[in-house]
């Protein structure tokens, strides 16, 4: 276990990639990584293969996407993270934007306890956790939400169609295959939602292009 912790620490490069982030933010990200490493075996929070590369695969991806999201709409004051699981990108958003209320929605009670523990350990007073299914959420209760590794765009729109209010926006973090998902959206869904690319981006290392998309409910 000590060797794994040392390996994780050795591959931590966020300070080099994001030098503009404050020392407090960097410290919270490092502590969050330690919590993920500690509890992953029991809770299956992320793929074990990604543990040595958490900084690039999970943290950098979430940081870049969340920054793009708030650049797209700086007036967001409450953001839901649907299917939060390990807390990406919701915990990242909470650390970067402490004045924004972040609600993590997760159906697995054990993962909810982990998320609550993370919020406490990182002193994130802007975070709340909902142990529920998205389908069970109150009608038209959500104005802004984000998903990562949740479902394809079409399925995400179907699952969230009741809880997202009119003019509400659902953001989708996607890999380079995002165009295929957009092309597969049924015509009927496009009468309810309007899809759009917000921005493509690349991680600090590698050439793969990722994307943040949004679907606005009509």
Feature map (PLM): residue ranges:
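Conserved SAM/SAH cofactor-binding pocket of Class I
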Residues: 52, 63-147, 157
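Conserved hydrophobic residues forming the short capping helix/wall of the S-adenosyl-L-methionine
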Residues: 40, 119, 164, 185-189
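Residue-level signal for inorganic ion chemistry
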Residues: 36, 174, 215
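Conserved beta-strand segments of alpha/beta enzyme cores
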Residues: 101, 126-128, 169, 192-197
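Active-site capping/gating segments
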Residues: 177-218
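A short glycine-rich, Lys/Arg-flanked "PGG" loop and its adjoining helix->strand segment in the class I
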Residues: 157-169
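Class I SAM-dependent transferase core
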Residues: 1-76, 80, 110-127
């Amino acid at each position: 276990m000590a060797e794994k912790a040392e390996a994780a620490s050795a591959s931590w490069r966020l300070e080099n990639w994001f030098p503009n982030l404050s020392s407090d933010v960097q410290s919270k990200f490092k502590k969050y990584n330690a919590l993920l490493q500690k509890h992953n075996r029991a809770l299956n929070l992320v793929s074990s293969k990604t543990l040595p590369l958490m900084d690039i695969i999970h943290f950098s991806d979430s940081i870049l996407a969340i920054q793009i999201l708030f650049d797209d709409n700086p007036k967001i004051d409450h953001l839901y993270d649907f299917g939060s699981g390990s807390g990406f990108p919701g915990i990242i958003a909470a650390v970067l934007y402490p004045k924004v209320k972040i609600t993590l929605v997760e159906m697995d009670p054990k993962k909810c306890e982990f998320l609550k523990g993370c919020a406490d350990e990182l002193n994130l007073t802007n975070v709340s956790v909902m142990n529920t299914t998205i389908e069970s959420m109150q009608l038209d209760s959500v104005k802004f939400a984000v998903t990562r590794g949740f479902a394809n765009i079409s399925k995400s729109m179907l699952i969230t169609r009741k809880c997202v209010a009119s003019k509400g926006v659902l953001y989708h973090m996607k890999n380079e295959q995002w165009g295929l998902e957009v092309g597969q959206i049924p015509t009927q869904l496009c009468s309810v939602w309007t899809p759009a690319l917000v921005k493509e981006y690349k991680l600090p290392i590698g050439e793969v292009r990722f994307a943040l998309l949004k679907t606005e409910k009509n």
